[in-house]
């Protein structure tokens, strides 16, 4: 009985298609940096973040963690055949430039770099200023 149940749960493995050109979306916040590498249509090929590569707490927000995450995402993307990426950077965090440099050093060719940080036209009230 148990053997039949296990055989019924087999899932189909996705076939890997070669994607020569992709997009790298870097979301850099004050607490973490998330890198997603997608194909031109926007389907995610690989991703990594500061927490994904083993950093916890305030260490996730460091430029070093962003670099390690970018390297990890680039390695996974290169297994899918990605060779060149157009970079889209969003957010005010400290890991922006380091992540782009790490993508280049991992072996990906960076085509263009675009800042897509959303700008509020007098939207919500910003958080109060810190008193340290």
Swiss-Prot record:
Question: What is the protein's name according to its record?
Answer: Small ribosomal subunit protein uS11
SUPFAM superfamilies documented for this protein: Translational machinery components
Q: What PANTHER family does the record point to?
A: 40S RIBOSOMAL PROTEIN S14/30S RIBOSOMAL PROTEIN S11
Enumerate the UniProt keywords alphabetically: Ribonucleoprotein, Ribosomal protein, RNA-binding, rRNA-binding
Molecular function GO labels: rRNA binding; structural constituent of ribosome
**Per its UniProt record, what InterPro entries does this chain match?**
Ribosomal_uS11, Ribosomal_uS11_bac-type, Ribosomal_uS11_CS, Ribosomal_uS11_sf
List, in alphabetical order, the GO biological process terms annotated in this UniProt record.
translation
Q: Which Gene3D superfamilies match?
A: Ribosomal protein S11 (3.30.420.80)
The family this protein is said to belong to: Belongs to the universal ribosomal protein uS11 family.
**Which residues constitute the signal peptide according to the record?**
none
The chain's coiled-coil residues are: none
Q: Name one Pfam family in it.
A: Ribosomal_S11
- GO terms under cellular component: ribonucleoprotein complex; ribosome
* Transmembrane regions listed in the UniProt entry: none
Q: How does it assemble?
A: Part of the 30S ribosomal subunit. Interacts with proteins S7 and S18. Binds to IF-3.
- Which organism does this record belong to? Bifidobacterium animalis subsp. lactis (strain AD011)
State the protein's purpose: Located on the platform of the 30S subunit, it bridges several disparate RNA helices of the 16S rRNA. Forms part of the Shine-Dalgarno cleft in the 70S ribosome.
């Amino acid at each position: 009985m148990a053997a039949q149940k296990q055989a019924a749960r087999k899932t189909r493995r996705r076939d890997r298609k070669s994607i020569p050109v992709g997009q790298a979306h870097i979301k850099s916040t004050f607490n973490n940096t998330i890198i997603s590498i997608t194909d031109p249509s926007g389907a995610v090929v690989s991703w990594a973040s500061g927490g994904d590569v083993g950093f916890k707490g305030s260490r996730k927000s460091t430029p070093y963690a962003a670099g390690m995450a970018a390297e990890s995402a680039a390695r996974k993307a290169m297994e899918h055949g990605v060779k060149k990426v157009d970079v889209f950077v969003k957010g005010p965090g400290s890991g922006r430039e380091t992540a782009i440099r790490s993508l280049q050093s991992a072996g990906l060719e960076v085509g263009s770099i675009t800042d897509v940080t959303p700008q509020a036209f007098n939207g919500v009230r910003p958080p109060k200023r810190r008193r340290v």
